[in-house]
Swiss-Prot record:
This is Putative pterin-4-alpha-carbinolamine dehydratase. GO terms for molecular function: 4-alpha-hydroxytetrahydrobiopterin dehydratase activity. The lineage of its organism: Bacteria, Pseudomonadati, Pseudomonadota, Alphaproteobacteria, Hyphomicrobiales. One of its GO terms (biological process) is tetrahydrobiopterin biosynthetic process. It comes from the Bacteria.
Length: 100
């Protein structure tokens, strides 16, 4: 099982992942992605889902039209772990490759 990051380690990791922030009231990180339209948003989710499945680490997320809200936390560890940081970085990379 992945180990929960300390507060300091989480803050340091977040410093290297643009636009990800701590989720208020939870030991979790989150980001809202905004795309050109629904097709791009859903395409992002599809590509991110493939990565998440390979990692066996799945996000909490919500899609409304061109917006995708993501929350990451490792439930087994009770908070943010290196897996969440890795998936956040991957999602940022996928978003950069998404046209628009």
């Amino acid at each position: 099982m992945a180990e929960r990051l300390t507060t300091e380690a989480r803050k340091q990791a977040l410093g290297g992942i643009p636009d990800w922030t701590e989720v208020s009231g939870r030991d979790a990180i989150g980001k809202t992605f905004v795309f050109k339209d629904f097709n791009e948003a859903f395409g992002f989710m599809t590509r991110a889902a493939l990565v998440a499945e390979k990692m066996d680490h799945h996000p909490e997320w919500r899609n409304v039209y061109k917006t995708v809200e993501v929350v990451l936390s490792t439930h087994d560890a009770g908070g943010v772990t290196a897996l969440d940081i890795e998936l956040a970085r991957a999602m940022n990379a996928i978003a950069k490759l998404t046209p628009g």
